[in-house]
């Protein structure tokens, strides 16, 4: 689950991090009032969406009057912002954050942290190249990224934070200020089950003080049951409607931009299925894992979910029967096709537990369902059907 910038800053401020001041506005009048309250020579109006690249997409604007703040807010709120991190439809802008004047600054730094699966530890990353995408820095000048791995048994040590401060070129009081900032970030990361933390840029102001100008936080969704206050911050308007519906039925669904819907049990098999569809010249429309313990109701809902995507021109169902029985899947497929009145080609590949019985149910259903003998055959048939 992702947080908005204003939510991330509020959370980080609670752990002692110096964040750029800002006031949330839901309309032009509130934005104008926020500008007056901040009282600076200018302010920055930022669209609140769950996506990066807002500046280049026109979602971050500098304003020099209350009238301009109102005008910019009204031009953003109620629209969809399209960035390089969104799909073609973009993300809805329901509010803007009117931020205080902090510029000019001495320099802009970067500080982030992730859960490193290879080391099974939290890894902090810092760079002197703040204000630009860290992916670009990693690709062009990787030597400018400094990493610190934290032992979970002892936590982040002050000496580790000081070492990062030295590498960033900080001096005197800035070092202690940075140690406090990084320690607070680590505490927030652990206590709130972050999956991602990023401050970009971390500004060094003209007076030498540090300030978090932006804040990006991703929460491990599996931990939300023990984070009720964090769970309340969830903004469902920023999530794909079908992905949101899928979560209600414990389905793992990710929307893509192809035209071949996929229903598979098991994440690995789902990825392999998408790969072979691409190999055969097709384009998968989604990743959908119904899980190892799929029930008939979940399979029916999964089918409905796939067909709600109007770009889907065919469906490939690939089931390996282990825990789940292929005959139960076949019954669910038949029920779903009858209920929804499917008018696109459907190719089904069943292997494993009760696969023969499942194939019999499909063949005797009287419906236009194409059986496949193996994954290769299934991919070829669905690609051919869609291109026919």
UniProtKB/Swiss-Prot annotation:
Provide the E.C. number(s) assigned to this enzyme: 6.2.1.5
Which annotated residues bind Mg(2+)? Answer: 200, 214
Gene3D superfamilies hit by this protein: ATP-grasp fold, A domain, ATP-grasp fold, B domain, Succinyl-CoA synthetase domains
Which N-terminal residues, if any, form the signal peptide?
none
Q: Which reaction does it catalyse?
A: succinate + ATP + CoA = succinyl-CoA + ADP + phosphate; GTP + succinate + CoA = succinyl-CoA + GDP + phosphate
Residue intervals of the ATP-grasp domain: 9-245
Q: What is the enzyme's class at the highest EC level?
A: ligase
Family per record:
Belongs to the succinate/malate CoA ligase beta subunit family.
PANTHER family on file: SUCCINATE--COA LIGASE [GDP-FORMING] SUBUNIT BETA, MITOCHONDRIAL (PTHR11815:SF10), SUCCINYL-COA SYNTHETASE BETA CHAIN (PTHR11815)
Kindly provide the name given to this protein in its UniProt entry: Succinate--CoA ligase [ADP-forming] subunit beta
